[in-house]
């Protein structure tokens, strides 16, 4: 997946030039980006693409063709929007895995989630691209890559393995914990009573409690537990205190038992964490064996498509709004002829954005030609006569 891009043709080495801060300001790039999305990640992705320009004719036409497909097929766009949600999950998972403090246990479980997300995204892309008559080389190349992966003899086995392993991992819904108390009814240690395939509800807890309070046999004598862990004192101080002393807390007085060394952690939470971790360690042995077969698969390779998909979709949404306002739009054609540019009825996209936001005013289009006969224009006219607006519109034609 690393060599697939919706911005650049395969095996195409292209140099790009980055707009200066002055040019970004003159072209109101931030205004345009802000109108497309409020999501910070999306804004940064779109701005990065907009401000890194290429003059390569093949790349420009390649992008125009991809955008045409995404614009012309709303069902393609809808499918890609759903795909973005799954890719966002993978992106968040990737950020978590870069956390050096994450335990090996959770890294293993997240590796399972990563491959599961990979399988899901490949399947979604296949279903999306196979049902739409796309024409652009970029999307056709992506379709072929997905087909090659999906039809590979190992993909069905991968999908089956991951589905079965995820089912095992997701089957554990709750753990019933028993907490031992000392002579003054303070938590002493905790043990696992049962592993459950159902979630415990508040109503169930209340029902059991009411049953206990109304029962003739008030205490259960069954001693069987699966495992137990010692509890450390709650809210310990750095100094050792005598049994029965009172520590002044931020909001209330807390009774401290200092029979063990201070840890600074909530005792019950820490004990439960250890119990659950021990259970999961046993459960993930089969997961680890499954994942070792797929060490070369990276679900994060698909995340690289996110900024490109976002870029096309958000501009397609803007063009749809412009069409609703009867504003003219067209597909540009980049030609190999030396230093020529022709624009007919061009207008400033900032005005179009204001129209789509509900402002009512007339937009006047203008023609522009750059060739050997007309290379330099001198703009004259009164203040607020449209000189800056028109000059910016010319810049937008090249930017977009």
Task: Report residues per predicted region.
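Conserved amphipathic alpha-helical "coupling/scaffold" segments
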Residues: 1-192
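Conserved NTPase motor "head" modules and their coupling/switch loops across ABC/AAA+ ATPases, GTPases
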Residues: 2-9, 18, 308-385, 400
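Conserved P-loop NTPase architecture
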Residues: 99-130, 137, 141-149, 153-350
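Short, low-complexity, polar/charged sequence segments that are solvent-exposed and flexible
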Residues: 194-200, 360-363, 398
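Conserved glycine(s) of the Walker
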Residues: 385-387, 391
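GG-anchored amphipathic helix commonly corresponding to the ABC/SMC/Rad50 NBD signature/C-loop
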Residues: 391-400
């Amino acid at each position: 997946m690393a060599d697939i891009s919706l911005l650049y043709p395969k095996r195409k080495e292209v140099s790009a030039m980055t707009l200066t801060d002055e040019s970004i300001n003159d072209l109101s790039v931030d205004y345009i980006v802000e109108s497309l999305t409020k999501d910070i990640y999306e804004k940064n992705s779109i701005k990065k693409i907009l401000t890194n320009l290429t003059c390569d004719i093949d790349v420009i036409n390649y992008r125009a063709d991809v955008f045409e497909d995404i614009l012309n097929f709303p069902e393609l766009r809808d499918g890609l929007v759903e795909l973005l949600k799954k890719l966002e999950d993978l992106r968040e998972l990737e950020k978590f895995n870069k956390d050096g403090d994450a335990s090996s246990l959770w890294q293993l479980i997240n590796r399972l989630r990563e491959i599961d997300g990979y399988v899901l995204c490949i399947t979604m892309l296949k279903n999306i691209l196979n049902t739409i008559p796309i024409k652009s080389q970029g999307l056709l190349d992506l379709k072929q890559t997905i087909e090659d992966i999906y039809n590979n003899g190992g993909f069905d086995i991968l999908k089956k393995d991951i589905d079965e392993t995820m089912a095992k991992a997701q089957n554990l819904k709750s753990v019933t914990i028993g907490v031992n108390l000392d002579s003054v009814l303070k938590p002493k240690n905790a043990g696992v009573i049962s592993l459950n395939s159902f979630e415990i509800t508040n109503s169930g807890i209340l029902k059991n409690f009411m049953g206990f309070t109304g029962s003739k046999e008030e205490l259960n004598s069954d001693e069987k537990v699966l495992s137990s862990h010692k509890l450390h004192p709650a809210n310990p101080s750095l100094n050792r205190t005598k049994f029965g002393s009172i520590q002044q807390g931020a909001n209330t007085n807390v009774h401290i038992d200092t029979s063990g060394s201070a840890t600074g952690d909530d005792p019950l939470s820490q004990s439960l964490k250890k119990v659950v971790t021990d259970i999961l360690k046993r459960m993930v042995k089969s997961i680890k064996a499954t994942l070792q077969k797929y060490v070369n698969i990276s679900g994060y390779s698909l995340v690289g498509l996110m900024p490109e998909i976002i870029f096309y979709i958000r501009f397609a949404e803007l063009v749809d709004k412009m069409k609703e306002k009867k504003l003219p739009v067209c597909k540009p054609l980049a030609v190999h002829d030396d230093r020529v540019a022709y624009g007919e009825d061009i207008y400033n996209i900032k005005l179009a954005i204001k129209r789509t936001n509900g402002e009512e005013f007339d937009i006047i289009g203008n023609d522009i030609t750059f060739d050997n006969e007309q290379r330099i224009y001198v703009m004259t006219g009164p203040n607020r006569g449209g000189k800056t607006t028109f000059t910016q519109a010319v810049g937008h034609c090249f930017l977009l």
